[in-house]
Amino acid sequence: MLFRSDPASVVVPFASRRPAAAAPADPVSRRPVLIVLHRETSTPGRIGNALRALGYKLDIRRPRFGDALPETLEAHAGAVIFGGPMSANDPDDYVRREIDWIAVPLREQRPLLGICLGAQMLARQLGASVAPHAEGRVEVGYYPIRPTEAGRALCPGWPARVYHWHGEGFQLPDGADLLAAGDDFPVQAFQFGNAFGLQFHPDVTYAMMHRWTTRGCLRMDQPGAQPGHRHFTERAVHDAAERAWLEHFIDGWIARAPRTMMLQAAE
């Protein structure tokens, strides 16, 4: 089932960052954020850290291993769908169910964030295609992105280069705003109402990078991939900007709960 809507085309900038708090102050923020992971050992990384710093608890679920996704997000402040080694085009039942489920936060206008595979699943739910690069190139390492006018209006301070780990990309869904572009994979970030998709991985911690470059060392032999040592030398240069941008982005994204949701939570 594909979601259809006519979201407002005006990009509303994120508010200035709030200070980190031990506990959220408003009723909506007391609700946990749904975290969707795709491997037994996966973690929400820096995104989880940023949400916890704002006072949110995390409801972690792994549909691939039998965890059910909720029929509504009324009990959650928002949802994040992370990456994984599978494809959004895979025929597995859990992949199809997860893509179908994305209609729930879209319909309820809850904050939704897709990272890499999660962004591709969101794009598919919105009717866009997901496919490998025409020449077989991948992005594994740090690559430049270019924020669009809409992206700069939404959130300032975009990093010049960001971390990637993917071999597929997607078209910009109809009705979505392009927030950032790239070279080999043109769509790097987009917005559809309160839903956002990021093709790159600002969630990756230093420990995660060690695991990925060790267990996924064969990926670095693919066309376009960077050798393992460059992942760490470029991290030393670009990571601070990517982390600062992510913290601002997460704060602004999770604050986009619909007004009706806030009123219901306060009752």
Could you tell me what each predicted segment is?
Residues 3-93, 97-110, 221-267:
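N-terminal beta1-alpha1 cap of cysteine-dependent amidohydrolase-like domains
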Residues 29, 35, 146-267:
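Amide-donor transfer/coupling interface in amidating biosynthetic enzymes
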Residues 44-46, 70, 90-92, 123-125, ...:
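Short glycine-/acidic-enriched loop or helix-start segments at secondary-structure transitions
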Residues 52, 76-79, 129-133, 149, ...:
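Short, hinge-like loop/turn segments at secondary-structure boundaries
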Residues 57-59, 129, 161, 177:
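Conserved beta-strand segments of alpha/beta enzyme cores
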Residues 74, 138, 174:
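Structured loop/turn residues at beta-strand edges in well-structured enzyme cores
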Residues 105-129:
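Catalytic nucleophile loop
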Residues 120-158, 163:
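Ligand/cofactor pocket segment of small-molecule handling proteins
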